[in-house]
């Protein structure tokens, strides 16, 4: 049985959403399920009651999360919900031309989610817009191995723990 993942998209220009669409297609081809939610008007409630999440976000300005992700980020920051039932991964988009803020949108989400008890599966995928590679192609190649090597084992361990506590 495949893994079910919610892909949350923070974007300014639509690139992260395009990446998410390619990622979802790769997941579905490999027998997994997923949904895409653009972060517009989302709050921390999106993470309840838990589950598997993939944050796909660009970086904007001086290392900020995109405008459409601000409400969600602020909700996490002020509400401080317990996210111990959340397993997540990250696709961070940036440009090394801005080396001091490269992929900071993703890094900020990573730090916040970890502070709130969420468990990150594997390492963050960082795409450099100056690299000459297309972010959607890189992410589509990355996501299925990420699920199978990192996310699925964490989900199985969490499911076992939950059933033992029931």
Regions found by a protein language model. Give the residues of each.
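FMN-binding flavodoxin-like domain, especially the glycine-rich phosphate-binding loop
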Residues: 2-4, 14-18, 26-30, 49-166
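Domain-level signal for soluble alpha/beta catalytic cores
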Residues: 4-8, 19, 35, 41, ...
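A short, well-structured beta->alpha microelement
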Residues: 28-46
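Active-site neighborhood of thiol-dependent amide/isopeptide-bond enzymes
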Residues: 9-13
């Amino acid at each position: 049985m495949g893994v079910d993942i919610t892909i949350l998209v923070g974007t300014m220009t639509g690139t992260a959403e395009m990446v998410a669409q390619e990622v979802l297609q790769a997941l579905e081809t490999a027998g997994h399920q997923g949904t895409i939610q653009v972060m517009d008007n989302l709050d921390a409630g999106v993470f309840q009651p838990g589950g598997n999440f993939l944050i796909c976000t660009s970086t904007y300005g001086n290392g900020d999360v995109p405008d459409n992700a601000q409400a969600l980020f602020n909700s996490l920051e002020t509400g401080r919900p317990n996210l111990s039932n959340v397993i997540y991964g990250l696709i961070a988009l940036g440009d090394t031309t801005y080396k001091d803020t490269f992929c900071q949108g993703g890094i900020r989400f990573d730090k916040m989610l970890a502070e709130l008890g969420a468990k990150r599966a594997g390492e963050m995928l960082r795409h450099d817009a100056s690299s000459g590679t297309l972010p959607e192609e890189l992410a589509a190649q990355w996501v299925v191995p990420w699920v199978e090597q990192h996310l699925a084992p964490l989900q199985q361990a969490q499911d076992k723990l939950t059933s033992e506590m029931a």
